């Protein structure tokens, strides 16, 4: 009989017969509290903080809580199959690890640890452009695991082109393009700590190892790290991008392209018109815009847009 996803709970109980208990709490609220106790205010605020007054993050949770499960009884569920097909790939469950940057502020093994965990369970790992570890090293840690690459779309076309070539060579099979970060959000928890990890050279590994990025520096990164950081800040995002610019990505990426941060059904239609393969209905976990519509509330409209892209994953943040 195939192993079910929830079999691990029985392992916990069986281990308890020898006096062993889980090393970490299984309650996510307690796990978050433990993380806040062990990490400094800067990392915690950066990971858990929201834009403005936090209203979008609260709306995300409230919207999900409004969607309730209605169980049905006396159904044959001895064989439970959660597998789905996404972007032409068969996945064991409708689950992927979303891109999270600067993971070294949370764990010393950063993105490599997350990639190994995803591969061990057969779920895709989406690597952030703003990772603490170069994409080639993360790909090696992922092994044969399904891996996708998230792009923060830089001003410099040559840097973007270089990122796409490197990601393809490293075995990343799909491209997720974040659209909802044309500018840095107003995040009070970060501002109150004056903490932005990129200014400390964290989350810049893909840039500092990129030949096109380094070509724009007067000195090597190790000789003038501050100049490298300023160059990164100046070219990280481009608020002037518009829909026709997507043609550049299609010309330079052979695999599926998914647009992350779509909330309006008209934008889902525009994505389809531009030849995109999917959208992620997301508000960046409330990190970018205070007062935004909740992702779960946008999902029916964005996912149901006639003529929209086929694949519509959703993240809460």
Where in this protein do the model-derived segments appear?
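Short beta->alpha linker loops
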Residues: 51-52, 129-133, 155, 263, ...
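Short, conserved beta-strand segments within well-ordered enzyme catalytic domains
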Residues: 68, 83-85, 94-98, 124-126, ...
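Glycine-rich active-site/cofactor-binding loop and its immediate structural neighborhood
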Residues: 91-133
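Alpha/beta enzyme core
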Residues: 102, 116, 141, 158-316
């Amino acid at each position: 009989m195939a192993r079910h996803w929830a079999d691990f709970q029985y392992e916990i109980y069986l281990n308890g017969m020898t006096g062993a208990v889980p090393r970490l709490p299984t309650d996510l609220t307690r796990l978050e509290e433990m993380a806040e106790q062990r990490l400094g205010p800067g990392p915690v605020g950066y990971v858990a903080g929201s834009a403005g007054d936090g209203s979008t993050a609260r709306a995300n949770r409230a919207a999900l809580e409004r969607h309730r499960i209605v169980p049905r009884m006396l159904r044959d569920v001895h064989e439970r199959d959660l597998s789905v097909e996404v972007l032409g790939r068969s996945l064991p469950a409708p689950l992927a690890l979303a891109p999270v940057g600067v993971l070294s502020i949370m764990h010393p093994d950063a993105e490599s640890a997350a990639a190994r965990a995803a591969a061990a369970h057969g779920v895709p790992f989406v690597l952030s452009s703003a990772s603490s570890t170069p994409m080639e090293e993360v790909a090696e840690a992922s092994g044969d695991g399904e891996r996708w690459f998230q792009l923060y779309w830089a001003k410099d076309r040559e840097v973007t082109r270089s990122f796409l070539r490197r990601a393809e060579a490293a075995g990343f099979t799909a491209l997720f393009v974040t659209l909802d970060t044309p500018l840095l959000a107003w995040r009070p928890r970060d501002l109150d700590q004056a903490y932005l990890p990129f200014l400390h050279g964290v989350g810049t590994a893909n840039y500092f190892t990129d030949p096109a990025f380094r070509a724009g520096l007067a000195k090597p990164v190790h000789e003038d790290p501050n100049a490298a950081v300023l160059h990164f800040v100046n070219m990280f995002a481009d608020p002037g991008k518009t829909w026709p610019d997507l043609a550049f990505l299609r010309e330079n990426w052979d695999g599926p392209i998914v647009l992350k941060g779509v909330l309006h059904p008209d934008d889902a239609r525009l994505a389809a018109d531009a030849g995109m393969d999917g959208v992620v209905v997301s508000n960046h976990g409330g990190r970018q815009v205070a007062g935004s519509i909740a992702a779960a509330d946008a999902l029916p409209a964005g996912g149901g847009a006639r003529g929209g892209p086929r694949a519509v994953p959703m993240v809460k943040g």
